């Protein structure tokens, strides 16, 4: 896709190419070997959260880059660019810019609601998740009952919370305020520290590579 939101991996072989949305699906084929080379190790330790576009971490594994398509034939693989983000001079004023940004966000959220699985929205207590949930409720004709929301918290977090430069306030009260305002059926999922540790292996298997530690584990739970 244009922005690489939904990944597509590929692995050239002697007789063709394997492709899937997850590395584990490719490595289920005996023709693919999950081997880390020097380049993959560098990606793993230096660029885990912002990997090089197209790099699949494992040797021989590649990822289709945002805005690109691939063509396979007997001569190998060719990357075709079908879309690229262009930087242009911004002429609109603040009011028009805000209206346009709101329109684009509403359209983007509405498109994501087209799904063959139950809908849901994670409320973190921040601006992003609150705004997305509000746009989603509006796209569902204002029927907040159709958008269950949930937040993740830890036992005793409110009593023992200490502000940091990365997190100045406790998330849960703000998530609850957003849910009350929108009228969504809300659930707070309490995750004990031992549950986070117990899920490390499952989280790694789900991601196919190391990630954000306890953050990934809490989202998985």
Identify the function of each model-found stretch.
Residues 48, 209-215:
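Short, flexible loop segments at the rims of nucleotide/cofactor-binding pockets, characterized by
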